[in-house]
From Swiss-Prot:
Record keywords: Cytoplasm, Endoplasmic reticulum, Membrane, Mitochondrion, Nucleus, Phosphoprotein, Repeat, SH3 domain, Ubl conjugation
Subcellular location: Cytoplasm; Cytoplasm, Perinuclear region; Nucleus; Endoplasmic reticulum membrane
Full protein name: C-Jun-amino-terminal kinase-interacting protein 1
Gene from which the chain derives: Mapk8ip1
PANTHER family from the UniProt entry: C-JUN-AMINO-TERMINAL KINASE-INTERACTING PROTEIN 1, JNK-INTERACTING PROTEIN 1-LIKE PROTEIN
Keyword Mitochondrion: yes
Pfam (any one): PID
Domain SH3 residues, every copy: 485-546
Subunit structure: Forms homo- or heterooligomeric complexes. Binds specific components of the JNK signaling pathway namely MAPK8/JNK1, MAPK9/JNK2, MAPK10/JNK3, MAP2K7/MKK7, MAP3K11/MLK3 and DLK1. Also binds the proline-rich domain-containing splice variant of apolipoprotein E receptor 2 (ApoER2). Interacts, via the PID domain, with ARHGEF28. Binds the cytoplasmic tails of LRP1 and LRP2 (Megalin). Binds the TPR motif-containing C-terminal of kinesin light chain, KLC1. Pre-assembled MAPK8IP1 scaffolding complexes are then transported as a cargo of kinesin, to the required subcellular location.
InterPro entries from the UniProt entry: JIP1_scaffold (IPR047178), JIP1_SH3 (IPR035638), PH-like_dom_sf (IPR011993), PTB/PI_dom (IPR006020), SH3-like_dom_sf (IPR036028), SH3_domain (IPR001452)
Length: 708
């Protein structure tokens, strides 16, 4: 403090050029003296009126703070040496007692105070009075502010102009300082340096001047009138937005700008009488490094009493920095998110030299910018997430096509299938339920010899996404081997990579014909998809569900079979097991998708065999493939067919709905023919009649009735 005093007294002759006080003129009544050092640790009263009207506080004031020597060129010739310190005390006390003006009857008290202030003599006090000021203030702990002499104490209701009218509120709201942060001003004293000693210029402010009058530009010392104007309700907004971070001030040399602002940027809207004038010239400083933003600081950290700063010289530094008085701290959070209020409603920016308004600092809108950034970031995250979904779906479509998990039997026979085709079943597919895939081998496409074989040769609507034993195929796969037709017996549930020559490669859902089950839990089987034989671990496959033996025996006794040549368009999972609307919707879905790929991926020709057992889709193969014995087919048991029919407007389209043997899922298979499919639908109906007749004869034999 001695260094600070010496620095100030040394600058009395000529103020430093870098000082923020380029011009300060004070015309103050002589006996205008305030007690002001109300620190935060004593600020515990719940009623603000007790602080201003009674003696429930300790008035602490350091000698070095109240006896600061005046500076030549800053104080007028008619002012004494202690006028600067008294003015700073007045400025502080006015902010502290501002809440008292919110109570009923405050306006009447203000008028009386204005009259008292106008009647005071204009003679400045002596230095002896200034020297006795700390002692008199320390004695005022047990007295009210209005009980002392006029030279030492303020009247009971000190002067306030109430330039910022507020809605009357309860005292609890006005003075909610019971949770105030302790030792905040002591930390700031020990960790920060004086702005006068460092010679740091004042940063550009949001409000350069609060006056409605502009000084003449030709005056030697450009000044501003901070007397009686400005009704800026946004003073609380900007002050709250400029709240310092909750942590202690920075101690590094590079952080002195932060500590400087922490000390001074709360001390702006000082309320003086109409007779008092302060002329300050704003000095622009280069933008300081980015300061940490504090988004929605708690009230105990963002608010700051004017008395928490022990350096009174800093109180007259800022001409335009907003400062929340105690009565305004709580409501400062109500307008955090309104950056539009950062400008005074009366008329924008008023600079001392008429210069255009400076660009607003980032720290002034740190909270609002953080809010807007959060919303923008949220929007970007949503967009990015949607983009990632699109990217992740494309390889999934490719995997469906490669892994034979698409919606059509023929689509997976060619690797060039469009991703649109693989998405056929998405509209009717429930999320947790796997879509039944359909696949026929390349043997069914004699017109495309160059297309490589599909990775998976699955049964119609076999679920490639379900790995449980209950997710079996919608139909059974059969294959002609050595002139004899065999149906699949097992289905692969895991992928098996062979490590020896005699092992069989398996993909998930491969149709298998197990020929031998060894005791060491290895199976010797034939892979109907690849046409290869080998061994694999028994736990890599499960047995498929077959029709009962008695039903198979009844079907073999029937010689009735109808055959129809059609082209298979595809299959799609549907939400319901019957209905013309369901059938037509599935046909429309598949036909629309197939139209996009009909040129490079034409539908496969097949033969529909209708019998009492069910419906078999036999793939038409060429002679070379038939010689190899690779003729394959898909079989659907008649008991699992729930609905069939042709399109009412175009009878060339035929479809039937099948139920999954184990799961509660349904799929619709669509075909197209060159001729009408009415005969096909009638054949399926006749098969149902025969099947029902045989079923009834088996379950309810007539001879049993006669025997009874």
């Amino acid at each position: 403090m001695a260094e600070r005093e010496s620095g100030l007294s040394g600058g009395a002759a000529s103020p430093p050029a870098a000082s923020p006080f380029l011009g300060l003129h004070i015309a103050s009544p002589p006996n205008f003296r305030l007690t002001h050092d109300i620190s935060l640790e004593e600020f515990e009263d719940e009623d603000l009126s007790e602080i201003t009207d009674e003696c429930g506080i300790s008035l602490q004031c350091k000698d070095t703070l109240s006896l600061r020597p005046p500076r030549a060129g800053l104080l007028s010739a008619g002012s004494s040496g202690s006028a600067g310190s008294r003015l700073q005390a007045e400025m502080l006390q006015m902010d502290l007692i501002d809440a008292a003006s919110d109570t009923p009857g405050a306006e009447d008290d203000e008028e009386d105070d204005d009259e008292l202030a106008a009647q005071r003599p204009g003679v400045g006090p002596s230095k002896a009075e200034s020297g006795q000021e700390p002692a008199s203030r320390s004695q005022g702990q047990g007295q009210g502010p209005g009980t002392g002499s006029g030279d030492t104490y303020r009247p009971k209701r000190p002067t306030t102009l109430n330039l910022f009218p507020q809605v009357p509120r309860s005292q609890d709201t006005l003075n909610n300082n019971s949770l105030g942060k302790k030792h905040s001003w002591q930390d700031r004293v020990s960790r920060s340096s004086s702005p006068l000693k460092t010679g740091e210029q004042t940063p550009p402010h949001e409000h350069i001047c609060l006056s409605d009058e502009l000084p003449p530009q030709g005056s030697p010392v450009p000044t501003q009138d901070r007397g009686t104007s400005t009704d800026s309700p946004c003073r609380r907004t900007a002050a709250t937005q400029m709240a310092p971070p909750s942590g202690p001030p920075a101690t590094a040399p590079g952080g002195r700008g932060h500590s400087h602002r922490d000390r001074i940027h709360y001390q702006a809207d000082v309320r003086l009488e109409a007779t008092e004038e302060i002329y300050l010239t704003p000095v622009q400083r280069p933008p300081d490094p980015a300061e940490p933003t504090s988004t929605f600081l708690p009230p105990t950290e963002s608010r700051m009493s004017v008395s928490s700063d022990p350096d009174p010289a800093a109180y007259s530094v800022t001409a335009g920095r907003p400062h929340p008085s105690i009565s305004e701290e709580d409501e400062g959070f109500d307008c955090l998110s309104s950056p539009e209020q950062a400008e005074p409603p009366g008329g924008g920016w008023r600079g001392s030299l008429g210069e255009p308004p400076p660009p607003p600092r980032a720290s002034l809108s740190s909270d609002t910018s953080a809010l807007s950034y959060d919303s923008v970031k949220y929007t970007l995250v949503v967009d990015e997430h949607a983009q990632l979904e699109l990217v992740s779906l494309r390889p999934c479509f490719g995997d469906y096509s490669d892994e034979s998990d698409s919606a059509t039997v023929y689509d997976n026979c060619a690797s060039a299938s469009s991703p649109y085709e693989s998405a056929i079943g998405e509209e009717y597919e429930e999320a947790p339920q796997p879509r039944p895939p359909t696949c026929l081998s390349e043997d069914s496409t004699p017109d495309e010899p160059d297309v490589h074989f599909s990775k998976k040769f699955l049964n119609v609507f076999m679920s490639g996404r379900s790995r449980s034993s209950s997710a079996e195929s919608f139909g059974l796969f059969s294959c002609v081997i050595n002139g004899e037709e065999h149906e699949q017996t097992h289905r692969a549930i895991f992928r098996f990579v062979p490590r020896h020559e005699d092992e069989l490669e398996l993909e998930v859902d491969d149709p298998l014909l197990v020929e031998l089950q060894a005791e060491d839990y290895w199976y010797e089987a034939y892979n109907m998809r690849t046409g290869a034989r080998g061994v694999f671990p028994a736990y890599y496959a499960i047995e498929v569900t077959k029709e009962p033996e008695h039903m198979a025996a009844l079907a073999k006794n029937s010689d009735w079979i109808d055959q129809f040549r059609v082209k298979f368009l595809g299959s799609v999972q549907v939400p319901y097991h019957k209905g013309n609307d369901v059938l037509c919707a599935a046909m429309q879905k598949i036909a629309t998708t197939r139209r996009l790929t009909v040129h490079f991926n034409p539908p496969s020709s097949c033969v529909l065999e209708i019998s009492v057992r069910g419906v078999k889709i036999g793939v038409k193969a060429d002679e070379a493939q038939e010689a190899k014995g690779n003729k394959c087919s898909h079989f659907f048991q008649l008991k699992n067919i729930s609905f069939c029919g042709y399109h009412p407007k175009n009878n060339k389209y035929f479809g039937f709905i099948t139920k999954h043997p184990a799961d509660h899922r349904f799929a619709c298979h669509v075909f197209v023919s060159e001729d009408s499919t009415k005969a096909l639908a009638e054949s399926v109906g006749r098969a149902f009649q025969q099947f029902y007749k045989q079923f009834v004869e088996y379950t309810c034999p007539t001879e049993d009735i006669y025997l009874e």
